[in-house]
Structure formats: C-alpha cells, structure tokens
C-alpha cells in the first residue's frame, strides 16, 4: 500500500500552493489530488442534496470526504502514494479512514495567522470576500480540532514554502510524520 498524506486548513493557508509544488516534483508512484477538483456546488444545491449542514464542515463536506477516500483506497492498494489537499475536518477524515480500512495516514494542518491569511486572500488570490470573520473562525476551528487530535501543524506564515514541501515529501516517501489513527470502534 502506498503512503497517504492529507493536508487540510482554511482558505489562504497555502494548501494548493504547497500541493502544486509537490506535484511539480513529479515524485515516482505518487499522485496529488485536490478536493475542489470535484467541483463545489452552490449553497442551494448543497442544501437541496445534503440538507442542513452545507456550511464548511457540514454534510456535503462529510459526504465528499467519504467519497474521495473510497477513490484513494483503490489508488493506495495499487502501491501508489497519494497527497490529498482540501478543507477537511479531521473528524470526517478519521471516519473515512475507518470506513475504508486505511491505516497509517499522515494528516497535516496548514495554518497561518489571521493577518497572513487576510493578506493572501486579498492580495495574492484576489478573493477579499473570503477574508471574513467566518473564514477566520473556520481556520480556528480546524486548528483546535488538529490540536485535540494531535495532528502535525505547519505554520505557513512562518515557514518557507520549500520547508513545508520538504516535510510533506518526507511523509510521502519515508513516513516521517505523525499518523492519524482510524476512529476507534464503539464496543
């Protein structure tokens, strides 16, 4: 089975930038997958198809995390390593790992302070509408969830991109990261 690294974090944390940098290295037997590549439906469509909980961390995100994990399992079974990025709740990741019997996944939260996030969203990405209190609260929520789950956190506001890429490549190639265990079965 290939190595599996998931990077999560709020908008502006550097997930796509870092994942693209890893992708550009063209590591042998390694695929990079982007959560948003499946397309993000409108709020109305999410509400219609998945009910309440269409906001970040809601029912749609959970359903897509489970769906993606099924795809990834088949790739890992072929001996190919996978880097997966997206704004994913750790609770959903853990549930999906359990459902798909994937052990040894490396989960990394990419995070930065609110000022850095705002600067990136406004200046670098030209999406100032995302630099709002809801996004800052979402990033804080993911940070707290990562701390509680003892997930590795990389501060992309302080670390150079090259260092973040190095850490992720190390996880993909040598397993040098903390592993998130599947959710324990209730007895």
Language-model features: where?
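ATP-binding Walker
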Residues: 13
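P-loop (Walker A) phosphate-binding loop of NTP-binding proteins
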Residues: 10
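Small-molecule kinase domains that catalyze NTP-dependent phosphoryl transfer to phosphate-bearing small molecules
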Residues: 127-167
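Conserved phosphate-donor/acceptor-positioning beta-strand/loop module used by diverse small-molecule
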Residues: 86, 101-123
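Glycine-rich phosphate-binding loop used to anchor ATP phosphates in small-molecule kinases
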Residues: 59-102
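Walker A/P-loop
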Residues: 16
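Hydrophobic anchor at the beta1->P-loop junction of P-loop NTPases
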Residues: 7
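Conserved substrate/cofactor phosphate-moiety recognition/catalytic segment
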Residues: 20-69
């Amino acid at each position: 089975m290939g190595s599996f690294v998931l990077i999560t974090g709020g908008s502006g944390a550097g997930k796509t930038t870092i994942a693209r940098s890893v992708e550009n290295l063209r590591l042998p037997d390694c695929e990079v997958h982007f959560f948003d590549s499946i397309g993000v439906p409108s709020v109305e469509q999410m509400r219609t198809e998945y009910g309440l909980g269409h906001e970040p961390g809601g029912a749609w995100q959970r359903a897509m995390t489970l769906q993606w994990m099924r795809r990834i399992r088949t790739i890992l079974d072929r001996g190919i390593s996978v880097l997966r990025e997206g704004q994913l709740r750790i609770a959903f990741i853990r549930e999906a790992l359990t459902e798909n019997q994937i052990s040894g996944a490396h989960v990394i939260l990419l995070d930065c302070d609110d000022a850095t996030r705002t600067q990136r969203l406004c200046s670098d990405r030209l999406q100032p509408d995302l630099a709002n209190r809801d996004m800052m609260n979402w990033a804080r929520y993911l940070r707290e969830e990562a701390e509680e789950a003892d997930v590795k956190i990389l501060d992309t506001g302080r670390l150079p991109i090259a260092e973040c890429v190095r850490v992720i490549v190390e996880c993909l190639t040598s397993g040098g990261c903390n592993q998130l265990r599947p959710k324990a079965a209730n007895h």
